[in-house]
């Protein structure tokens, strides 16, 4: 299946350069170091559920990135993704540790279905402040206000059916990768392994 092939190629130790290239194209950052980690999210004590994502990596020593390939729409990605995000974030802090030690967490959802009513195939969600109500404003002299409550939590949603509807820009690294991912034949994954 596509998600199995995805995990086999991008989540395999020794394939860090392939994963690095994909993540740089999605996150638009330079990755200096990457470590592929165990993608299992520890069991929740209440419901006993274990979450297993396709790929987990630590980037540049200060960011945890999870990638999940969803082939079928289970009508819950708007609940599932934030649950994984906050669980990974909170599980970092052990008793007695300082909050300053908590790393940024990014969850990337590559969806083989349309989910959100948005006109972009790649949507990024962060915790942003809403616009202040006029009667709640206090003149404190801030010319530019903070936009984010925190930059530590981030979700990406890449909806492949939307991407398939556009002419890909083959000079764009992300669109090159999405063309490969959209081609569900095993030969594509084999080719990717050979190239790298």
Where in the sequence are the language-model features?
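Elongated, amphipathic alpha-helical interaction scaffolds
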Residues: 1-196
